[in-house]
Amino acid sequence: MELDQNATEKVKAMFTAIDELLYEQKPSVHTQSLQKECQQWASSFPHLRILGRQIITSSEGYGLYPRSPSAVSASHEAILPQERESTIFGIRGKKLHFSSSYKASPSTKASGSSADGEEADCIIFSEGIIEEYLAFDHTDMEEGFHGNKSEAATEKQKLGYPPIAPFYCMKEDVLAYVFDNVWSKAVGCMEQLTRSHWEGFASDDESNVEITRLDSGSPYMLNEQQPLVLPRVPQSKVMSVTSNPMNFCQASGHQPNVNGLLIHGMPLQPRNLSLMDKLLDLDDKLLMRPGSSSVLSNRNWPNRAMELSTSSLSYTTQSARRRNPPPRTLHPISTSHSRTGTPWPAEEILRGPRLPMTADSLSSPSPMTMGRNNLLPPIGTADVEHLSILGSQRPTKPHGDSSRARSAAVDEPNQQPQERLLLPVFSRPNTTQSFLPETQYRSSCASECPHHARPGRGSAGPQSHGSTKPQSRGGPISRTRQ
C-alpha cells in the first residue's frame, strides 16, 4: 500500500509540474527534459500552437468538443495577432472556474459580435451521461459542394445510413406521405384499365358466370376467394372448367373399380346428388320410428334406376360419412307406397356371417353386383326370380344374429310381396357392405340351407306366388308374383 501511495504521489507531482510549465511557465527539476523536448518541437514545427486549457477530464461526464480546429485557431488569431512569433512556443489561455465554464469570458465579449457567433456555432458544451451513439448529417460534405445539393444527396445515399437527424426524418415522412397518395391514385387508374380490358374480352353469356360462381363442388373453385364485384368471365375459362366431366368426377375423391358398369349422363350429376340428399334427409326425419328394417329406397323406380346408378359411385364417399357413425333406429315399412300382405320367413330371422368389406367386394365385380339402395336397373323377371331364391336361402344361416330383422318381423307383419323379395338384400342400410356378389350368396347358402330348412315357415310365404323355379344346388323352392 505504501509503495502504491508513493508512486501515485510521484505521478501526481509530475503532472502538476507539467501543467505549471505549460500554463504558468514555472520551471522545475522534473520539467527540464520536457523543456528540451518542447524546444525541439518548436524548432521543427514553427507553425504549431497550443491554445486553451483542459478544464476537466472527460471521465467526469461532460467536456468541450470543438467542431473544427481551424475555426478556433482563427478566432484566437484575431484576438492575439501581435504576440505570435515563429521561434517561440507560445501557450495562450485563461483559467476559468467550473461554475462559469459555459459562459463567455469578458475578453471574448469585447472582441466583437462576429467572433461570438463563430465560437457559439463551433463549440458544443455537453453535460451529463454521454451514450455511445453517433449521429451525423455530413454537413461538412455538403459545404464542400458549395451549394450543389444533388451531388451531396447521391453521396449520402451510397453510405446506407438511415435518417437520424430530425430534419431528414421529417423529409422522409413527407416523401412517404406523397408516395402513398400517388400510389393510391395509380392503383385506382390501373384497376379501371384492368376491368375495362377484362370486360372487353368477356362473353355476354351470364349463365356461364353463374355456373362458375355457384358450383361449390368444383375442385378448381374450392380455395378461391371471390371478390365482391366480379367482372364477367370469358367463355374459354368457363369451358375449361366444365368441358371434361370425367376429370371433374375423378378429382372429387377416390373412386372404386367400376369395370363392367355402364356410366353415362355425367352432366346430370348435380341433379342426382340433390335427389340423393333429399332421400337421406327423408330418412333422417323417420329416425324416431323404431321397429323396422326397410329402406325408403326399396321402392321401384324404373324410370330413374339408370340415373341413380350413374351417381351412386361418386356419392359413396359422401353417403358413407352419414351412414357409418353410431347405429341408429331402423326405419318403418308402412309408407305411402307400401301395402298389406302376408308375412314372409325372411322377415323374422336373418342369420349368417358378416360379409366382406366394400373394398373386398369391389375388387371383383360380377353381373349380379347389387347396391344397398336399389341403384341397378331392373333387367327382367328371371333376375327377380333369382333374387327370390337368394332371399329364401338367407334365413336358414345359423351363424350370427340380427335384431333389426327380428324386430321388423314382429312389429310389421303385413308387408308388400314385391318389397319382401329384395328385403334380405337391401334392408340393412347401416352395415359396411355395399355390393354383394352372387358367388358369395351361393357359397354361403348352399352349405347351410340343407341343415336348417324350416318347412313350416318356408311354406307360408311361397303359397301366395304363381310361378315356380327349382334351385340349382338344392334347397327350398321360392315363388314370385308376376
UniProtKB/Swiss-Prot annotation:
Alphabetized UniProt keyword annotations: Cell projection, Cilium, Cilium biogenesis/degradation
Example of a GO biological process term: protein localization to cilium
Keyword RNA-binding: no
Superkingdom classification of source: Eukaryota
Region (Disordered): 314-344, 356-379, 391-482
InterPro entries: DUF3719, FAM149
Bias-annotated ranges (Polar residues): 332-341, 428-446, 461-471
Location(s), subcellular: Cell projection, Cilium
Function: Involved in the localization of proteins to the cilium and cilium assembly. Indirectly regulates the signaling functions of the cilium, being required for normal SHH/smoothened signaling and proper development.
Entry protein name: Primary cilium assembly protein FAM149B1
Lineage of origin: Eukaryota, Metazoa, Chordata, Craniata, Vertebrata
